[in-house]
């Protein structure tokens, strides 16, 4: 087996140099990194991470011990822990005890002998574990008497209470309660919650505890019981399947409703009686505690349940069939809505017709809708809402339902720009967005590339905080400037239209403190800072693809292809990365704040046309659109509807991790300036500014002529 000494001899470098390269320290030249890496490949060297960690006195191992591997909620727990630890130097392993206390004891002894960083246990023995040194110990779901350990679980008693309340509300009076052994606290708490409600309601009820190995037999005992139960309250997806199978075999014609406390799943819909517990998020919280990325100080953490899917605000079927027409931008969210529209029609009897248009056409159609009954709902770009929202939309009262309940699902970071026009609430946030920086993590973390960047620029390769740093990195990753660049271009610009060109320029200008109006409201772009920024912006365009990108989705496709190292794009178009065919970089994408810290807000809001007569149908559409389930489904499909619960949906965050950064981008971002000029119009301003910027970028006009043209047109539009 090759050793570090063998590598040093073959590479012709010192033992310390080999160690520095293997540990990815940035103090080694590119030449020596290449020598060491070539020697490693030739010798087939595999570093023994465990031996290294044991030498340090502690391994970066995290072990999860569960009763059964096939139980879905335990798989979710593992997935949640893995989601957080994936980007850390931790080795995560899951073990099964087969719900045997004896096997658990042996496993714990074996694992603790290797001194793991953390041990996560769903205990079969309920015996306190003698921890090894400073390992963190977490008991999950089943309480164990150990004041030194952490305990993470859900409020199982409340879950039982709410499950039983739902059964009673549905008219069930003969109820069976089915769960695992009573010795485990989760089952005991669940049964307590169920029984308290059922007895108070005068229901006939029986409790069926069962070992996992006997659950199928217990399910048959329930469906064949002389009590002829009309409902079963079940703890666990697997037990639900046992009951369904037993019922199908024994007496499929008899009425039996199953209410289940289960893991979170996108497959649950409004019709199901699934009460969700988010075990992936539970695992995520435990992993954050392991990494000390939480402010929690208590040893015990009881998380709230996700519960039923919008139990009181699910859409209902209306008396007569209707069609509502939605005018919106051609976007990922519109695409997702079209895919889900048949589901909405099936639930409510309301047909949803979605009319999509490009950006400029949508603006014109929205203006013309003042005198038209063609649309019941209109999606406006948030940059236009202040200007025309009050003229075309009905007011919305967020203090009364359903809008009060709907608004409670939104992030508190969403600014008023998505709601207000003429100081009245006339719209709800729809496909809200903000600019974010997307970058290739594999490039920014590569030790050879990092050293090459240092030798070229004399600074470390880190995420750009300023546009000067951004331009320097873009230049390094542009092949025409650096022949060894792994990408053809450092970045991209979307300059296919005047509005997109303005959106690319404004964050850079604002990051330097730029302002395009004076204290009197005079709109001006003739100051030296504007000229300096435009020259810099034109220079940065030397690091972008030669073909013109017309829209943000095209920039994301360019990025997903591996052709560019980084890009700044509105986040509601970022899903294009995941949907790009044959991308090798899907799991190598990072996101961050835009350089300079002044992202533009984007996306749109949705309002009710003043001319609609279908207010009941519109109400049901909003209930459906903003439900937790629909918001999740739209996000799965690549769109985005803001909902607080998305931040704990690990499946969605695994697909689209930048959703976790939307709140921060919203807090930092802006689109409007409070311009003291009554004639000012955001849409016209961006069109005028962007047109002149494009002329300068394409070499149609020199910088001074482009600025003069912009000022002339701005004067005509706003400074009369």
Positions of PLM-derived features:
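Flexible loop/turn connectors
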Residues: 226-234, 238-321
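Flexible loop/hinge segments that line or gate small-molecule binding clefts
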Residues: 122-161, 258-273
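Hinge/lid segment of periplasmic solute-binding proteins
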Residues: 382-436, 588-592, 655
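N-terminal helix-turn-helix/winged-helix DNA-binding helices
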Residues: 41-73, 77, 88, 113
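C-terminal capping/gating helix-and-loop segments adjacent to ligand/active sites or protein-protein/ligand interfaces
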Residues: 356, 420, 549, 660-718
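Glycine-centered hinge/linker elements that transmit conformational signals in sensory
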Residues: 471-476, 508, 512-550
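Extracytoplasmic/periplasmic substrate-recognition and gating elements
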Residues: 541-542, 580-646, 670-678, 691, ...
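N-terminal helix-turn-helix DNA-binding module of bacterial transcription factors
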Residues: 1-58
């Amino acid at each position: 087996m090759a050793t570090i000494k063998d590598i040093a001899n073959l590479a012709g470098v010192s033992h310390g140099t080999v160690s520095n390269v293997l540990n990815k320290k940035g103090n080694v030249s590119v030449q020596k990194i290449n020598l060491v890496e070539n020697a490693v490949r030739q010798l087939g060297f595999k570093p023994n991470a465990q031996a290294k960690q044991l030498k340090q006195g502690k391994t970066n191992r995290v072990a999860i011990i569960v009763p059964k591997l096939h139980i879905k909620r335990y798989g979710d727990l593992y997935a949640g822990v893995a989601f957080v630890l994936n980007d850390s130097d931790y080795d995560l392993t899951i073990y099964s005890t087969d719900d045997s206390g004896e096997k658990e004891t042996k496993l714990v002894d074996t694992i603790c002998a290797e001194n793991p960083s953390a041990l996560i246990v769903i205990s079969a023995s309920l015996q306190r574990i003698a921890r090894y040194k400073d390992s963190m110990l977490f008991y999950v779901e089943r309480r164990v008497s150990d004041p030194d350990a952490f305990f993470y679980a859900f409020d199982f008693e409340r879950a039982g209470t709410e499950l039983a309340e739902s059964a009673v509300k549905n008219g069930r009076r003969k109820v069976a309660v089915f769960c695992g052994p009573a010795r485990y606290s989760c089952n005991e708490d669940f049964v307590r919650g169920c029984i308290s409600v059922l007895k108070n309601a005068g229901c006939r009820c029986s409790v069926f505890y069962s070992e996992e190995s006997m659950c199928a037999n217990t399910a048959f005992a329930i469906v064949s019981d002389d009590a002829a139960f009309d409902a079963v309250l079940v703890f666990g997806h697997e037990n639900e399947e046992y009951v369904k199978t037993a019922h199908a075999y024994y007496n499929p014609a008899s009425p039996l409703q199953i209410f289940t406390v289960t893991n979170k799943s996108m497959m649950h819909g409004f019709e199901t009686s699934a009460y969700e517990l988010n075990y992936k998020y539970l695992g995520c919280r435990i992993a954050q505690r392991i990494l000390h990325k939480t402010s929690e100080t208590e040893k015990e953490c009881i998380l709230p349940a996700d519960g039923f899917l919008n139990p009181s605000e699910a859409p209902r079927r209306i008396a007569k069939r209707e069609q509502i027409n939605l005018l919106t931008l051609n976007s990922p969210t519109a695409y997702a809505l079209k895919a889900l529209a048949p589901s909405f029609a099936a639930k409510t009897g309301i047909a949803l017709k979605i009319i999509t248009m490009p950006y400029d056409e949508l603006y014109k159609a929205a203006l013309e809708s003042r005198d038209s009954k063609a649309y019941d709902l209109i999606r406006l770009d948030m940059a236009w809402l202040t200007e025309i929202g009050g003229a075309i939309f009905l007011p919305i009262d967020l203090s009364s339902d359903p809008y009060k309940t709907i608004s409670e699902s939104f992030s508190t970071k969403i600014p008023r720009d998505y709601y207000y026009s003429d100081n009245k609430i006339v719209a709800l946030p729809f496909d809200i967005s903000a600019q974010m920086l997307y970058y290739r993590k594999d490039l920014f973390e590569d030790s050879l590339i990092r050293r090459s960047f240092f030798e070229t620029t004399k600074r470390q390769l880190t995420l750009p905080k300023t546009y000067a740093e951004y331009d320097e990195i873009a230049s390094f990753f542009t092949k025409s400037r650096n022949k060894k660049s792994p990408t053809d271009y450092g970045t991209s610009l979307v300059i296919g239209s005047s509005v997109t060109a303005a959106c690319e320029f404004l964050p850079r200008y604002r990051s330097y403190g730029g302002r395009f109006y004076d204290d009197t409201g005079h709109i001006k772009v003739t100051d030296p800072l504007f000229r300096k920024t435009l020259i810099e912006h034109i220079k940065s365009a030397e690091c972008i693809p030669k073909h013109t990108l017309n829209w943000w989705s095209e920039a994301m496709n360019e990025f997903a292809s591996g052709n560019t190292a980084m890009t700044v794009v509105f986040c509601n178009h970022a899903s294009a990365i995941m949907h790009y065919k044959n991308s090798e970089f899907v799991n190598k994408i990072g996101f961050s704040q835009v350089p300079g810290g002044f992202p533009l807000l984007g996306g749109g809001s949705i309002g009710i046309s003043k001319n609609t007569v279908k207010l009941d149908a519109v109400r049901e559409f909003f209930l459906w659109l903003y439900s937790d389930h629909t918001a999740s489904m739209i996000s799965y499909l690549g769109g985005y509807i803001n909902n607080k619960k998305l931040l704990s949906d690990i499946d969605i965050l695994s697909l689209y991790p930048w959703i976790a950064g939307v709140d921060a981008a919203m807090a930092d971002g802006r689109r409007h300036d409070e311009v003291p000029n009554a004639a000012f119009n955001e849409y016209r301003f961006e069109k005028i500014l962007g047109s002149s910027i494009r002329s300068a970028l394409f070499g149609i006009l020199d910088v001074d002529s482009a600025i003069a043209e912009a000022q002339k047109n701005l004067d005509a539009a706003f400074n009369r």
